[in-house]
């Protein structure tokens, strides 16, 4: 066990999906955490704030004493039981606090008093975070190929099929468009970046990489920003463009926006609440681009959406949605993407239907 006491091989820890018992306060965990970490705080947000104020006014010894007074008795025992249960569930896990300082050492000592010898991360979350940032910068230097195409071209599916493909939208829990949100909330920016770094490390470790295959994304995917080092490389990367028939794109979007999302919402919340959430999801997607559509056009498409939802609720048909989706593609999404693609025309190395692009990728 001794060699695990103060782990410092941070890349190996990230590659192994090492369980982390993160004892930072919930607010710290929400701001940024490593994939697979579970948050079992030594101090809750209000307790941490009180200790921090005490530290500034009275010094370290007084702050430490206050911390022990706040986390004592039943509170201490409840948290200790939670840490014990977590270690029993993840015997290969590590304790982690912000910098590998007092919080993880205190929890480690309390666990040792119960007979559990749980190692900790030397340097804490900050060290793991810095490792993730460095790994992303380093791995982003490898060649990149982008998959482009208008909305509904099946780009994400194509990326997922590549052994060296990185599904940025999957990592961001968002499909990129105003209708791109999923039932899973997006991670914080730091947590997204950490997850991306681990994904890059894993793929790099298991593939003989000539290049990464990524979807042609903007600077943001929903609320998450792509790391600047990756964006800079993507801006220079060659692009293979999927050009599928409009009707085929519509069918993909029907499946994605209407059939699958309706299923997911009702599966998660039940028929009535799920339908309400699904309706709000579509309305929110349209509302998000109202200024670019113009308020009159937005109002017209909203009325059409309402009629389509009424038809779907009545007989299950999603055909009515085409009456607002088709003009939305023709008037907004397609012109916007084509304008963006024109600025990168010199980077286009191949274009064709989905299957032709897939075959071309295999031949590279």
From Swiss-Prot:
The keyword Transferase applies. GO terms for biological process: tRNA wobble uridine modification. Residues 14-137 form the Rhodanese domain. GO terms for molecular function: transferase activity, transferring alkyl or aryl (other than methyl) groups; tRNA 2-selenouridine synthase activity. SUPFAM superfamilies: Rhodanese/Cell cycle control phosphatase. The active site is at 97 (s-selanylcysteine intermediate). Pfam families: Rhodanese. It catalyses: 5-methylaminomethyl-2-thiouridine(34) in tRNA + selenophosphate + (2E)-geranyl diphosphate + H2O + H(+) = 5-methylaminomethyl-2-selenouridine(34) in tRNA + (2E)-thiogeraniol + phosphate + diphosphate; 5-methylaminomethyl-2-thiouridine(34) in tRNA + (2E)-geranyl diphosphate = 5-methylaminomethyl-S-(2E)-geranyl-thiouridine(34) in tRNA + diphosphate; 5-methylaminomethyl-S-(2E)-geranyl-thiouridine(34) in tRNA + selenophosphate + H(+) = 5-methylaminomethyl-2-(Se-phospho)selenouridine(34) in tRNA + (2E)-thiogeraniol; 5-methylaminomethyl-2-(Se-phospho)selenouridine(34) in tRNA + H2O = 5-methylaminomethyl-2-selenouridine(34) in tRNA + phosphate. Its EC number is 2.9.1.3. Keywords: Selenium, Transferase. Belongs to the SelU family. Involved in the post-transcriptional modification of the uridine at the wobble position (U34) of tRNA(Lys), tRNA(Glu) and tRNA(Gln). Catalyzes the conversion of 2-thiouridine (S2U-RNA) to 2-selenouridine (Se2U-RNA). Acts in a two-step process involving geranylation of 2-thiouridine (S2U) to S-geranyl-2-thiouridine (geS2U) and subsequent selenation of the latter derivative to 2-selenouridine (Se2U) in the tRNA chain. Monomer. PANTHER family: TRNA 2-SELENOURIDINE SYNTHASE. This is tRNA 2-selenouridine synthase. It comes from Salmonella agona (strain SL483). The gene is selU.
């Amino acid at each position: 066990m001794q060699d695990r006491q103060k782990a410092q091989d941070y890349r190996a820890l990230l590659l192994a999906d090492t369980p982390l018992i993160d004892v930072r306060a919930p607010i710290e965990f929400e701001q940024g955490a490593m994939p697979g970490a579970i948050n079992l705080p030594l101090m809750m947000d209000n307790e941490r704030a009180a200790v921090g104020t005490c530290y500034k006014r009275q010094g370290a010894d007084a702050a430490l004493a206050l911390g022990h007074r706040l986390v004592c008795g039943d509170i201490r025992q409840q948290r200790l039981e939670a840490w014990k249960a977590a270690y029993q569930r993840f015997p290969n896990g590590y304790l982690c606090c912000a910098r590998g300082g007092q919080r993880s050492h205190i929890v480690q000592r309390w666990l040792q008093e119960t007979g559990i010898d749980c190692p900790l991360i030397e340097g804490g979350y900050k060290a793991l975070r810095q490792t993730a940032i460095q790994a992303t910068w380093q791995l982003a230097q490898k060649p990149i190929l982008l998959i482009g195409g208008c909305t509904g071209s099946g780009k994400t599916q194509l990326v997922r099929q590549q052994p060296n493909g990185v599904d940025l939208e999957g990592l961001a829990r968002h499909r990129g468009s105003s209708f791109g949100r999923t039932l899973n909330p997006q991670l914080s920016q730091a947590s997204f970046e950490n997850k991306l770094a681990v994904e890059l490390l894993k793929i790099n470790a298991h593939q003989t990489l000539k290049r990464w295959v990524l979807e042609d994304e903007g600077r943001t995917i929903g609320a998450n920003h792509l790391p600047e080092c990756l964006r800079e490389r993507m801006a220079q990367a060659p692009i293979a463009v999927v050009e599928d028939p409009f009707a085929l794109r519509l069918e993909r979007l029907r499946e994605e926006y209407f059939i699958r999302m309706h299923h997911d919402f009702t599966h998660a919340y039940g028929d009535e609440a799920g339908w309400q959430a699904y309706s709000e999801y579509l309305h929110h997607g349209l509302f998000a681009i109202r200024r670019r559509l113009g308020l009159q056009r937005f109002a017209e498409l909203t009325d059409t959406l309402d009629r389509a939802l009424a038809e779907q609720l009545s007989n299950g048909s999603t055909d009515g949605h085409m009456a607002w989706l088709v003009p939305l593609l023709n008037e907004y999404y397609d012109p916007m993407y084509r304008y963006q693609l024109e600025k990168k025309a010199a980077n286009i190395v191949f274009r064709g239907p989905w299957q032709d692009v897939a075959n071309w990728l295999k031949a590279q």
